[in-house]
Amino acid sequence: MAQLKPGVVSGKDYLTLVGAAKEGNYALPAVNVSSSSTINAVLEAAAKNQADVIIQLSNGGAQFYAGQGLKDGFKAKVLGAVSAALHVHLLAEHYGVCVVLHTDHANKGLIPWVEALLDHGEAYFKQHGKPLFSSHMLDLSEDPMEFNLSECARILTRMAPLNMSLEIELGVTGGEEDGIGHGEHDASADNSHLYTQPEDVLQAYERLSPIGHFSVAASFGNVHGVYKPGNVQLR
């Protein structure tokens, strides 16, 4: 575990957490949650194992968290994520663990969801002096590179003053997760995009690093979910 004050971490503390994991040769598990019960289970497991952890919500998980009684699906996705974040903020320090609070894959259609969460995040930061979420993810890997980087730059410009980090995706991860997926795990498809290209990473670094902190979800042939035997070639 990193030698940090327990609770939700962000900014320099987030970098310290990642640095401790690298130095200690261990991974930070990222666990998707969809209810207060699953959040509590993750916190309890982390505390028992004296391990820091990433707690994250997909858009569907956030909607489920808000409950089926909310008929406005978009509002449910926003309020569910905010409610879950507040729950983690309240309890994490009492479990004695450091938590990176993150939202999972958001494609082009979910950019408004991320922006709505930033609206809440800016209000939270103004009141508490810290961000609501540690980081968000934009998965625009199916879109042209220029659109991917320009949108990531625009969103990161909002996030940087809040001491938040942005996760981006370069190269397509095959399969599907919570409705966000790609069909390139099919053996008949041209799967060259399943492998992140070094020149794309360099371009992202040159474009985004002057704005704020970001991380890259790199693809090396890995896929989400179920796939046919022989179709996955990791390299």
Predicted region positions:
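N-terminal amphipathic alpha-helix/helix-capping segment at the start of soluble metabolic enzymes
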Residues: 1-29
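Short catalytic-loop micro-motif centered on adjacent basic/acidic residues
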Residues: 28-32, 101-103, 137
